[in-house]
From Swiss-Prot:
Catalytic class of the enzyme: transferase
Name the record gives this protein: Probable lipid kinase YegS
PANTHER family: LIPID KINASE YEGS, SPHINGOSINE KINASE
InterPro entries: ATP-NAD_kinase_N (IPR017438), Diacylglycerol/lipid_kinase (IPR005218), Diacylglycerol_kinase_cat_dom (IPR001206), Lip_kinase_YegS (IPR022433), Lipid_Phosphate_FormReg (IPR050187), NAD/diacylglycerol_kinase_sf (IPR016064), YegS/DAGK_C (IPR045540)
Subcellular localization, as worded in the UniProt entry: Cytoplasm
Entry's cofactor comment: Binds 1 Mg(2+) ion per subunit. Ca(2+) may be able to substitute.
Protein's organism: Escherichia coli O139:H28 (strain E24377A / ETEC)
Gene name in the database record: yegS
């Protein structure tokens, strides 16, 4: 095998007992690849490991986990100063893996690992909220976000996507649309939003295509707002994301401002952020990511 620069794998602590992953790493090491492995235990670990990766001089930092792990590692990478910043590699090990799935990362661990180490590094965008928090995939808001956040893990494990509908029915008396005003380039909307999706990537919630036209290197955010008066039909339609839904409002802009008279919550790659005012902007070509040559999210 051709020689490749060293890589550092930042592995989510929940995946440490993954025997196939251990075997894949050992096999690549036997073939001559240098792969350092670090395991996260708490928030902040990923940033420290990225700093260590720079001191080691690795060419790639691999995020081994779900969307949250990819978010942490990519955020740490774009905060690096200077030259020779490592590229991002992706090893999907989470329960949803929305970003990895949408960009075409192989499901097979050995293939995904080889791509993460030896794939072509492409400059991609990220998004930033209120000049602080970042997301690489999507920000989602509305009652759908509250349902997916609050649905018990045991119910999700037992029933999958149906669990969200059941939990939504149980919460019917407390679910209300979010009244808000959203502005962007050549875009202005005000009303009651059942679900809001602002995407650098296309899907969230374990496969829901909320922003099907999004690209990760076009310098734009895609916006989709689901409106409607009846909660139950809206809940079902948002899970199905019907293209013919008359209650879908779309927009595209390099930034969006969102204001609400009450506190609303956005889910940023799995992490909640609450407030009344949000400024969301694209960060063009913020980092390099190793992607397959046929990645559908590249223009």
């Amino acid at each position: 095998m051709a020689e490749f620069p060293a890589s550092l794998l930042i592995l989510n602590g929940k995946s440490t007992d993954n025997l196939p992953l251990r075997e894949a790493i050992m096999l690549l090491r036997e073939e001559g690849m240098t792969i350092h492995v670090r395991v996260t235990w708490e928030k902040g670990d990923a940033a420290r490991y990225v700093e260590e990766a720079r001191k080691l001089g690795v060419a790639t930092v691999i995020a081994g986990g779900g969307d949250g792990t990819i978010n942490e590692v990519s955020t740490a990478l774009i905060q690096c100063a200077g030259d020779d910043i490592p590229a991002l590699g992706i090893l999907p090990l989470g329960t949803a893996n929305d970003f990895a799935t949408s960009v075409g990362i192989p499901e097979a661990l050995d293939k995904a690992l080889k791509l993460a180490i030896a794939g072509n590094a492409i400059a991609i965008d990220m998004a930033q909220v209120n000049k602080q928090t970042c997301f690489i995939n999507m920000a989602t808001g509305g009652f759908g976000t509250r349902i997916t956040t609050e649905t018990p893990e045991k119910l999700k494990a037992a029933l999958g996507g149906v669990s969200y509908i059941i939990h939504g029915l149980m919460r019917m008396d407390t679910l209300q649309p979010d009244r808000c005003e959203i502005r962007g380039e050549n875009f202005h909307w005000q009303g009651d939003a059942l679900v809001i999706g602002i995407g650098n990537g296309r899907q969230a919630g374990g496969g829901q295509q909320l922003c099907p036209n999004a690209l990760i290197n076009d310098g734009l955010l895609q916006l989709r707002i689901f409106t409607g008066d009846e909660i139950l039909p809206a809940l079902v339609s948002t899970l199905k994301s019907d293209e013919d839904n008359p209650n879908i409002i779309e927009g595209a802009s390099s930034w969006f401002d969102i204001q609400a008279p009450h506190e609303i919550t956005f889910n940023l790659d799995g992490e909640p952020l609450s407030g009344q005012n949000f400024h969301i902007e694209i960060l063009p070509a913020a980092l390099r990511c190793r992607l397959p040559p046929d990645c559908p999210l590249l223009r």
